[in-house]
Amino acid sequence: MTTIKPMLAHKLDKTRIDWDKPVYMQPKLDGVRCLIQYEVFPISQGGARIVAYSRTGKEFMNVDHIKNDLVHLFEACPWIVLDGELYNHNLRDNFEKIISLVRKQKPTYEDRAEARIWMQYHVYDYTGKDYGSFEGLGYRDRLDNLTCSDMYTPSVCYVESKRVKSMKAANDFHARTLAKGYEGSILRTDTPYKHGRSFGLMKFKDFSDKEATIIGYDVGQGKRTGTLGKFVMQDDDGVEFGCPPGKGYNYKDLANILNNIEEYIGKRATFTYFERTKTGSYRHPLFKTLRNYE
């Protein structure tokens, strides 16, 4: 399968913004990045079909309801590659629920039924298999095409995009998205789609995501006796730190983690933090999930 490397965001750099040109803001979704395209395989591999995959090229197998909704789009535009997020704002405080649906590689009938209820695809950009033909297409034109598209359904969602003309307007938008429960905001400039990091895509975020390795744990105390208290993690620079579970984990979840702790030790995990300390550690780190879905 020929996969596309998605455009990735830099942290906000105000010097990269030209306010004389179009600038757009979108809510930042705390979901799983997903690209969807039409691909022709050998008959022995099932022939032509729509595929959904992660930014590292891992195919998602529990999103048939989304792919079915996009059949008409890919019949008309087989060259397009949609870029978006597997997300549901009703699960904004339960990231692990999204992950549990996404990581199913051999979904059962019940898994697919649950995915139809909860899993949405939020589309915020697109590119094409023939990247060269998109070299001069800025985000304003791509956004116009997304806005006018008839592909949207209850499972395929349009991501709100608003043009802003000043840093104050961008900050106001960011404050509103936080108030609505989003994890941050994305700022887009009117630049072509780029595979890899691009200053055409910058993120406003009070908390940052990072990966580290779980090397140990502490058990819960008091009311949390019998559950996980926190993980002990080590980042790629060798910094060790305690990392308690974040939002979305209840008593039963934490007890289950403790009972199966060997499945976590040595694994890569995503955590959030507010900022780095002067000694290089992390302020307010919180465990999100194992990094085993991409």
Label each PLM-derived region with a short phrase.
Residues M1-D20, M25:
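Charged, flexible boundary elements
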Residues R16-Y152, Y293:
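Covalent nucleotidyltransferase
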Residues C34-L35, L91-I98, S133-F134, S166-A175, ...:
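Short, solvent-exposed polar/charged micro-motifs at secondary-structure junctions
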Residues G84-L86, V123-G128, E160-R163, T189-T191, ...:
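Short, structured patches in soluble enzyme cores that scaffold and shape functional sites
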